Amino acid sequence: MKKTLLAAGAVLALSSSFTVNAAENDKPQYLSDWWHQSVNVVGSYHTRFGPQIRNDTYLEYEAFAKKDWFDFYGYADAPVFFGGNSDAKGIWNHGSPLFMEIEPRFSIDKLTNTDLSFGPFKEWYFANNYIYDMGRNKDGRQSTWYMGLGTDIDTGLPMSLSMNVYAKYQWQNYGAANENEWDGYRFKIKYFVPITDLWGGQLSYIGFTNFDWGSDLGDDSGNAINGIKTRTNNSIASSHILALNYDHWHYSVVARYWHDGGQWNDDAELNFGNGNFNVRSTGWGGYLVVGYNF
């Protein structure tokens, strides 16, 4: 959940090649030659998007595409499909049956038939990032739309680099104080670096970081038991991925760092009815991903 570009989609969405060293007459077969998709099993450890640390294993559908003026990445998760810790609620145990995130970008250059490139900036996009958590009640639902400007950057190196900056409109947010209003901004940077051929596949490094700032959520939220604010105005999530990709199978190991993840104030003391606990929203967690491209 909430991982964005964890598996082979990261490699393929940021690069133009889908196969690795495949001859033209020996390419693998997929359902579509432009809509690339996979089904994944994802194991998460110590994720920090909420007030309590979460571990779970879930099923995921992932898709990515880049065709003419349309650039897309997205996924849909069935949370806790294969189980999780006591704080992880999902499809089978009265939690959310669906969590999804999509990142469509629309090329301004191609839609206007205008070359807007200059310096290292190759192409410009109307960039979007939409997040939806279905939940089973109001306190379990989220609907967030980031919208803004994106670009691809020529680094002169064997790597791909893109940046997006967004304004955020917050609809539902698990009952938080910033619902149904414009509330803050996000800067996203993504990069992809091919490393080497390994064991018949391609080993790559993918990184992306979300910087969220300018929200009023911290100011508008109440105090925790220990006197500090329960929420924050800013947060950071930074992911670092090693991905091994084959024609149909892909494997990823992900390390992610959160600073006040989900805009929860680290060390705030809370009680949800089962005793006091301290928020641990700053620190490291990780994911393991196994997926099949079809």
Swiss-Prot record:
Answer whether the UniProt record assigns the keyword GTP-binding to this protein. no
InterPro entries associated with the record: Channel_Tsx (IPR003055), Channel_Tsx-like (IPR018013), Channel_Tsx-like_sf (IPR036777)
Q: Which GO terms describe its molecular function?
A: nucleoside-specific channel forming porin activity
Quick one: signal sequence residues?
A: 1-22
Q: Which GO terms describe its cellular component?
A: cell outer membrane; pore complex
- Does this entry carry the keyword Protease? no
Where found? Cell outer membrane
Q: Report how it sits in the membrane.
A: Multi-pass membrane protein
> Its Gene Ontology biological processes?
monoatomic ion transport; nucleoside transport; symbiont entry into host cell
- The principal location of this protein is membrane
Tell me which Pfam families the record gives.
Channel_Tsx
**What keywords appear on the UniProt entry?**
Cell outer membrane, Ion transport, Membrane, Porin, Signal, Transmembrane, Transmembrane beta strand, Transport
Task: Summarize the record's disruption phenotype note.
Answer: Loss of susceptibility to contact-dependent growth inhibition by CdiA-STECO31.
Give the protein family. Answer: Belongs to the nucleoside-specific channel-forming outer membrane porin (Tsx) (TC 1.B.10) family.
What does the UniProt record say this protein does?
Functions as a substrate-specific channel for nucleosides and deoxynucleosides. Has a greater affinity for deoxynucleosides than for nucleosides, and does not transport free bases. In addition, constitutes the receptor for colicin K and phage T6.
Q: What is this protein called?
A: Nucleoside-specific channel-forming protein Tsx
Q: Origin organism of this chain?
A: Escherichia coli (strain K12)
